[in-house]
């Protein structure tokens, strides 16, 4: 059978969120219950029983590991008074009666909690104090970031206000406006750029004796054609022709209309003269005489009709055994020769050909013309 203490602990653990005060209860009885509570509730229970802060250091170590895992969990100080002052201030703030009545009890509790570490000969900072220190640093960083954000938003708002359009009352603007024409006073100082341009202008006037360029005067002098080039024509201006309206007669119909049209003078248009200059020399160039090779065709194909065989013909043997080919070529060529090109014939095909095969010196007007003839026996 379980003891009464165990049953009470089980009941309190089941309802740990409803615990409001643990005054005058020692820590060893509340250890299992306090392990279930969270930080806000633990702070509230510590205020109801101030002596718990001397014993619940292990609970704050767990909270420190959970909330600040990357931070250092153990820190040391060389002065003991800092830690003692922290404990006494907490007791004085939450239970002032105990602070004044039981000083000996408080000193004994502090003596047991604040112990020098043998390894570095310093005093370890309590985990509750270290947790509050880290928490204050985080809150301070959050406040600084919030302040920076607030300043940035203020700057943006000021820039928007500067660029914002403002509606102006036109009546007030026209009342304040000075209608008199304001002029610059002579004794008022001018800008450096204005003074520099003024000095340059004065030096330019000294350099040119005529006093500088005057746009009203026409300085350009015409030299070509006696000074008349580019100007107006010297011929007298012809005034507009005055046309006297003639009274319209009803009796005349078409004849009067045509006569009136002839009487009306048409506006004089300038006569277009042809350019007297010679055209460019590049336009007189003739097309180059290119040599065009004539296709070599069989004489039999170009002359389908045949002529009679005479004694003047030369007979040649044909490579085919069943056909006797007789060719006769006249001293005058049948194909026309293009202008500028001299066509030569081989001496074996021309009667009385020269040594170089040219037949033109031996051609006569009365000479007989001969053509190639192919003899094909009947089948």
Swiss-Prot record:
Basic and acidic residues compositional bias, start-end: 311-325
**Which keywords, in A-to-Z order, does the entry hold?**
Phosphoprotein
Tell me which residues bear Phosphoserine.
235, 278
F-box domain: which residues? 19-63
What residue spans carry the Low complexity bias annotation? Answer: 231-240
Coiled coil location:
none
Its biological purpose is as follows:
As part of the CRL3 E3 ubiquitin ligase complex; polyubiquitylates monoubiquitylated RNA polymerase II subunit RPO21 to trigger its proteolysis; plays a role in global genomic repair.
- Misc note: Present with 815 molecules/cell in log phase SD medium. In contrast to other members of the family it does not integrate a functional E3 ubiquitin complex.
What family does the Swiss-Prot or TrEMBL record give for this protein? Belongs to the ELA1 family.
Put simply, this protein is called Elongin-A
Task: State the taxonomy lineage.
Answer: Eukaryota, Fungi, Dikarya, Ascomycota, Saccharomycotina
Q: Quick one: which gene encodes this?
A: ELA1
